[in-house]
UniProtKB/Swiss-Prot annotation:
MF (Gene Ontology): hydrolase activity, acting on glycosyl bonds
A single Gene Ontology CC term: fungal-type cell wall
Name of the gene: TOS1
Annotated Low complexity bias: 158-172, 203-222
Motif ExDxxE motif positions after renumbering to this chain: 374-379
Species whose genome carries this gene: Candida albicans (strain SC5314 / ATCC MYA-2876)
Name of the protein described by the UniProt record: Probable circularly permuted 1,3-beta-glucanase TOS1
Enzyme class: hydrolase
Segment forming the signal sequence: 1-21
Recorded catalytic activity of this chain's protein: Hydrolysis of (1->3)-beta-D-glucosidic linkages in (1->3)-beta-D-glucans
One Pfam family cited in the UniProt record for this chain: YJL171C_Tos1_C
Length: 467
């Protein structure tokens, strides 16, 4: 890469602004001010990424083709999966759509979608794979492992509503067979989600870091009408959503020597796989452990989800340019270990095509590297830190087929090491609002227009995009 004197001066200017703004440098990242809200404005662009069209289980090679997108929030208007990394306890999760929206992924006739009650760096798509565990699948199908930016604080103003845009589903077909030895064991990659949460060369430590108070340069989105809850979880109960993890070959999903474990149904405490969908009990997952929430709607045989790995557990994500995610969680400290991602919890969104192919592993086996979309909502970047940041990884502001664009804020949310954190993420128009709400906030069966617009109008830290 070439560096000009202009680039050097810009970097020095940014560093000077950071210091003068009173930002701190901790664990390789800059942090500025605590915030209750981060706002992304002007999100969505016309571009392309490389979509997976086939995965060869025998060679470990994948093929791709260019996929075009455009519109508000694109590519994040496509189906998204919701990811969690420990140490974390999830107490509530929900997804809302405008009451007049057709984006619901509820299948009334599918038994997997019924309400179920039982007793009670970034993380994801790294390019380099490290073998971290050896996995044995016993005769009962159980998995046994051996461990071998510039930000500004603004006051939002009301504005006219923006129309929602539907995403165009990409379709594909593929072949491949599940490979494996008769004894069903082998070394696999990152079964428990080990790997940096995000690529270091596009982390927030390289973003502009000054913080200044100035009025908003554009109006803020508003909504018309109520929002209806489409998916919901509390411990031991799921409504139109499903918990998955990476224990493929243990009750559900598949395993192969080249691609390792596919997605599987998670068991009740996320310690392994399951043969059927099971609601997660109230459980605290340990550092490095992960699970994923998808909608309760299975992908069909007609490739309505686009291409996905043969034999994997495949469900639709949460689509649309107008949607709201709600969360309640704890992120307790976990000092009992020294592994990668130790005591670095996170909550983030991925283009749902990524986990349905290969979240961790060969870069050409998912669309992540080429910019199909990741949004970090609440992420701890260094071990033991009490600061959670948000960051967007896609190609906006960068070249085609790249995730070197995006951006974020270096203002941070306080990590809930004791007590719970209630968070709301609103996708509307060309904006994304991520905010902490009061502990008394209830996530009922619907959200009224007044409540959502009040959240949108709250002041917050505005993220810089395309630096």
């Amino acid at each position: 890469m070439k560096f000009s004197s202009t680039t050097l001066l810009a970097g020095l200017s940014s560093l000077t602004a950071t210091v003068s703004a009173g930002c701190s440098f901790e664990g390789g990242n800059y942090y500025c001010s605590e915030t209750k809200k981060v706002i992304y404005k002007g999100i969505g662009f016309s571009g392309t990424y490389m979509d997976v069209t086939n995965m060869d289980e025998s060679t470990g090679k994948c093929t791709q083709q260019s996929y075009s997108f455009s519109g508000n929030l694109s590519p994040l208007d496509e189906e998204l999966s919701v990811h969690f990394r420990g140490p974390l306890t999830l107490l509530q999760f929900g997804v809302y759509y405008p009451s007049s929206s057709g984006n619901s992924k509820r299948q009334i006739d599918d038994q997997d979608c019924n309400v179920k009650h039982v007793h009670h760096k970034h993380k994801r798509a790294t390019e380099v794979v490290q073998v971290t565990q050896t996995v044995f699948v016993d005769g009962n199908g159980n998995t046994v492992t051996s461990q071998a930016l510039q930000t500004s604080t603004v006051e939002s103003s009301p504005a006219v509503s923006s129309a929602a845009a539907d995403d165009n589903a990409n379709s594909g077909s593929g072949s491949g067979s599940s490979a494996g030895s008769g004894s069903g064991y082998g070394s696999v990659s990152a079964l428990d989600g080990e790997g940096k949460a995000y690529r270091s060369d596009i982390s927030t430590k390289s973003a502009p870091t000054s913080t200044s108070a100035q009025p908003s340069s554009s109006e803020t989105a508003s909504v018309d009408g109520a929002w209806t809850r489409d998916s919901y979880y509390t411990p031991g109960s799921t409504d139109n959503c499903v918990f998955l993890n990476y224990h493929g070959g243990s009750g559900s999903g598949v395993w192969s020597a080249k691609f390792g474990n596919s997605l599987s149904y998670a068991n009740a405490d996320n310690s392994g796989g399951s043969s059927t969908p099971v609601p997660l009990e109230e459980t605290t997952i340990k550092s490095g452990e992960e699970y994923i929430i998808f909608s309760g709607s299975k992908c069909g045989s007609s490739s309505d989800c686009g291409y996905y790995r043969k034999g994997t557990v495949a469900y639709h994500g949460f689509k649309g340019a107008s949607k709201i995610f709600v969360f309640e969680f704890e992120m307790p400290s976990d000092t009992n270990g020294n592994g990668y991602n130790q005591d670095m919890p996170a909550v983030w969104l991925l283009n749902a095509k990524i986990p349905r192919t290969l979240q961790y592993g060969e870069a050409t086996c998912s669309c992540w590297k080429t910019g199909c979309g990741e949004l970090d909502l609440f992420e701890v970047l260094s071990s033991g830190s009490n600061k959670m940041i948000s960051h967007l990884h896609d190609g906006q502001g960068s070249s085609q087929n790249s995730n070197n664009g995006g951006g974020g804020s270096q203002d941070y949310f306080e990590r809930p090491t004791s007590g719970t954190f209630k968070g709301v993420v609103i996708f509307e128009g060309d904006e994304i609002h991520i905010l902490q709400v009061d502990d008394e906030t209830e996530f009922g069966s619907s959200l009224d227009e007044e409540t959502v617009n009040a959240w949108l109008k709250e002041a917050g830290s505005v993220a810089t995009i395309g630096y």
